[in-house]
Amino acid sequence: MRGEASRIADRESRDSLAPKLRDTREDAWRIGNELFTITKVLDDSIQLERALTDPSRPVADKVAVLKELLGDNAHPMTMEIMTDLVSRRWSRARDIANAVEDFGVDAMMYYADATDATLQVSIELSELHSALLNLPVVRAKLYDYQATSEARVKLFREVFSGKTLNKVTMRLAEHATCNLRRRRYLETIQWLINKFSRHMGESMVTVTTATPLKKEQIKRLVEVYSAKVGRQVHINSVVDPTVLGGMRIQVGDEVTDNTVVAQLQNLHRKVQTEATPA
């Protein structure tokens, strides 16, 4: 968990630079890729992270380190983002890499906006999450620390070679397995789904069922939960064959479990409570 100083630094930096990053439009693709590369470099070097976050070191020295790291090939916006980040105070050295990754995802979302692909990417990430839920062996290999990042990316491409995914979906999915960042693969995909949902100004409603939802069911769920939360919602449909009947619905931290298993568990608890002597 990030400390207070890091949370403030991340939020203020992204808020202040969001308009400029958004205005880069299709250049945001290049910027996002550069930021993902920098995230990996930082993750691989605690010494570099410390050099860029040392509060006793002048900002000018940190910028000099950045210029040596990035050279003359980085997009000006990438350099501006990194300069802003190294000028801020961080709770822990490694938190700066988290902020760089956040900016990278932001850039990819702005590129999706510029190419009218935001909703498509959000849906594809949800479908990817659902598909991998039923592929435990593949899922485990996608966050196997013993395998090289190249091997994990190659596996992802082989498994999903038959799907025509948007380039943003592909890049985000590959980033998630290329640079694991101490996360399970599906955790990262769910994190990305949530970020896209917030970016689109919607609430994410995750619905888990044994079989895929029909279009009519999704439409009805959108109507019901949009009215309930007071704003448009996006349905994240998850297929889990182990679910026995009914639906498990999650909105934020609130879970409504109407599956057969949940109802049996509730009945069992009720019977036990009633059977307990007063």
Swiss-Prot record:
Cellular location(s): Cell membrane
GO CC, one annotated term: proton-transporting ATP synthase complex
Function comment: F(1)F(0) ATP synthase produces ATP from ADP in the presence of a proton or sodium gradient. F-type ATPases consist of two structural domains, F(1) containing the extramembraneous catalytic core and F(0) containing the membrane proton channel, linked together by a central stalk and a peripheral stalk. During catalysis, ATP synthesis in the catalytic domain of F(1) is coupled via a rotary mechanism of the central stalk subunits to proton translocation.
Main subcellular location: membrane
Provenance organism: Bifidobacterium longum (strain NCC 2705)
Record has Translocase as a keyword: no
Membrane topology: Peripheral membrane protein
Coiled-coil annotated spans: none
Transmembrane segments: none
Binding partners and assembly: F-type ATPases have 2 components, F(1) - the catalytic core - and F(0) - the membrane proton channel. F(1) has five subunits: alpha(3), beta(3), gamma(1), delta(1), epsilon(1). F(0) has three main subunits: a(1), b(2) and c(10-14). The alpha and beta chains form an alternating ring which encloses part of the gamma chain. F(1) is attached to F(0) by a central stalk formed by the gamma and epsilon chains, while a peripheral stalk is formed by the delta and b chains.
Protein family per UniProt: Belongs to the ATPase delta chain family.
UniProt lineage: Bacteria, Bacillati, Actinomycetota, Actinomycetes, Bifidobacteriales
GO molecular-function term, one example from the UniProt record: proton-transporting ATP synthase activity, rotational mechanism
Pfam family, one: OSCP
Originating gene: atpH
Record keywords, A-Z: ATP synthesis, Cell membrane, CF(1), Hydrogen ion transport, Ion transport, Membrane, Transport
The name this protein goes by in its record: ATP synthase subunit delta
